[in-house]
Amino acid sequence: MMELLSNNSVPQQMASSNAPSANNVAHSSTANGSGGGSVSSNASNSSERLLAGILESFPAWDLNVGLLPNVGQSSPPRADFFINNFLGGLDTHGDFSIGPIGSGARSNPKMSPESSNNSSISCGWCEVSASIRCLECNEFMCNDCLREHRNSPLSSNHSIVSLPTPIGASPTGGSSVNAQTPPSGNFICDIHNEMLRYVCDYCRKLVCQCCTLHEHKEHSYASIQSFMVGSKEKLEGAIESSQVGTRCIKSSIDKALAFIRLIERNCSELSDNIRKAFRQFIIAIEDRERFLLDFVEKLRQRRLAILHDQMAGLKSALAGLSETSDMLSKVADNACNMDQIEIAMKLTNGQRQMEQFAGIYKDLQPKQEVFAFAPPDYSLLQDIRNQGGVILVDDKNLPIVSSSNGIVPSVSSVNAVAAASVGVVGGVAGVVGGVGVSNGLDLAFGMNMPNNPLSVASSSVRRPLLRDNSFRIPSPIMQPRGGSACGMSSGMSSAALDWELNGLRSSPGLHFSAPRTTQAIPGCMDLVKVRNSNALSLSFATEGHEDGQVSRPWGLCVDKMGHVLVSDRRNNRVQVFNPDGSLKFKFGRKGVGNGEFDLPAGICVDVDNRIIVVDKDNHRVQIFTASGVFLLKFGSYGKEYGQFQYPWDVAVNSRRQIVVTDSRNHRIQQFDSEGRFIRQIVFDNHGQTKGIASPRGVCYTPTGNIIVSDFDNHCLYLIDPDINDILSVKGHEGSGFHEFNRPSGLCCDDEGRIIVADSKNQRILVFNQNLDFMWDIEVRPSINPLMPPTLDEKDRTCDVAIMPDGRIVFLIELSPDSKEGSNPYKRFVHVF
């Protein structure tokens, strides 16, 4: 193609330019002879360097990390590297030597200096055909003028390049038979308007000769011909690198989407955790406030009673003293008419009475008592303001689980790491203010949200609007006991509570005097675990009005001795049966007085073996001893706190908290053991279809949560009473294994299994702790031949309970269109 000086470095060439003209000519021919080998050697070295780095020239993709920088090991090129590398890509032709030239004004060439075609370019000094070009002067010269140009002190170190061989011409100057088409503008340098002849390995772009001497002077480059050696391997490597890069980028995008969902879920859990945690502080303060106010009220009443008693005694003494004074006055007035003995008797009696009245006056003397309020330690306010915090769990300790959209951390694992890192209750170690740092951790969250899809309501379901219009009675503060986050005993299987824990995440510290764990049968010494049995073991309670007979019963429960308690609704009484089905005793009658009922419904027994009965049409709840003696009642008709409109079912937990389904008020209410209102959860018609129009059955789970059956919307709700929030929703109308049709009574065993009376589907459903179907009991004789043939095909299940040995006992009710007394042999209580 072209020729540039020789294989020597620029300083050597500049030194040689000072030699005589003859020597210069000889040296020029010698240089040309040896230059070809040097050029070939340089081209070979450049190609080897380029090919050796083919694989290293593409980005290094890491599928787990992303795009990693490719750090090269080559050192910067030498100062004269661009000359040697430049010569490697040149073809030589013709001779030229460097000699002294003079300086003087010369005319411009006939073509523009930017043109790369020298077929008609003339020397700007002597009008001879130009063969070289001075880059600094931007002038074309012939070989003779170059010598004069070199001899000038001002231009002795200028950069000289030879002009390219004309397109279509042979290197020797002859015409080419197959003339090539001139390159288009796309192959011309945008800066110097020169043909692109080299590939800059550093910049990954094509450059011209001028670029190699200026903009890319310190870079490593090679000719296009050398670069094209191994082009197939380069293309394959580039394609492979692009494919790997595509997979890496897509994987990173999937990770980002997964992390976005994780952040939304995590922040929601953080908010719930913060509300639940600080709610305990609020509850503790409210409890203390109510305790002190209650103490002041009792103190006021006691002091007023004492003062009123003192006033009554003093008034009595005053009246007696007045009578004595009148008697003595009469004696004084009639002394002349009275015997001495009579006078002495009157006088001594008067003196004795006056001494008694004086003693009363002395004993009943009012005393002034002034109490003062000892204010709390206000320095605790700052400590309370600094409680809690949010820390970042260290990624090094963060367990990783796989996801369909990438690799994402498990939130439950994050909680375990956060809890282990923090190791404190109610706060964060080393946290000061709202955001703290503990052992290099910057922010924290600690709530469990497993990925069970059953743990939350469907996104298409609008959750009921909850009102927190409640207050709590004074009660001592007690930290949770047991090894779990819910304060459960360490022996209880945490896997048995997955459905609740999926929605619950974790439970706060308790604010009542008992742990949150609740037994299936209060006070039972053994673990009650429901067992799968299709064999009918016992049936009793025929229809009628005699002892041991029932009329449209609804409520059912079992005590720790295995006695079966039934709310005999139409007979307005409660009957207690022995485990063998024989009647033990009964109590109650129709009326509105204490111990009287008007259609009793739900029934349960607490840890003290007290019997709690919902007096439905009297709109109240009554509590009796284990022998049926009336203790107390609470509730009346209305919509206010503590009032009911047709309450239906009742349940009690280990803290003796009583929960009642208030069907017509579309809510549930919670009370303490004495019937004092604690809280309510109101459902404002925002359920799957028309809201909880009629909450029916209710029970406590082993962790103290509440499950409510929605009679009209055919579903179950899992509720955390401490935060007044619905955690999970399950079911819809249908006859499948995960569907309900008028669900009614329900209960739980000690491992969290849920037993539901699916009323209109005429069956009993048993679910595990995740609400996955386990088995069912059909009550229609046509489907279940083990059922007594005396049952009608329209009979429904209404309530269910568990015997201490794990057998299921359920209650049958007549369908609304059935006629009473149609079958005297029909039994309403069945044990499987």
Swiss-Prot record:
NHL repeats lie at residues 537-580, 584-627, 631-674, 680-722, 727-770. GO terms for molecular function: protein-macromolecule adaptor activity; zinc ion binding. One of its GO terms (cellular component) is muscle tendon junction. Zn(2+) 1 binds at residues 123, 126, 145, 149. Zn(2+) 2 binds at residues 189, 192, 211, 216. A zinc finger (B box-type) spans 118-163, 184-224. One of its GO terms (biological process) is instar larval development. Residues 15-32 have a biased composition (Low complexity). 'Wech' means 'detached' or 'gone' in German. Interacts with the head domain of rhea and the kinase domain of Ilk. Interacts with AGO1. Interacts with mei-P26. Vital for larval development. Plays a role in tumor formation. A crucial component for the physical link between integrins and the cytoskeleton in the epidermal muscle attachment sites. This is Protein wech. It comes from Drosophila melanogaster. The gene is wech.
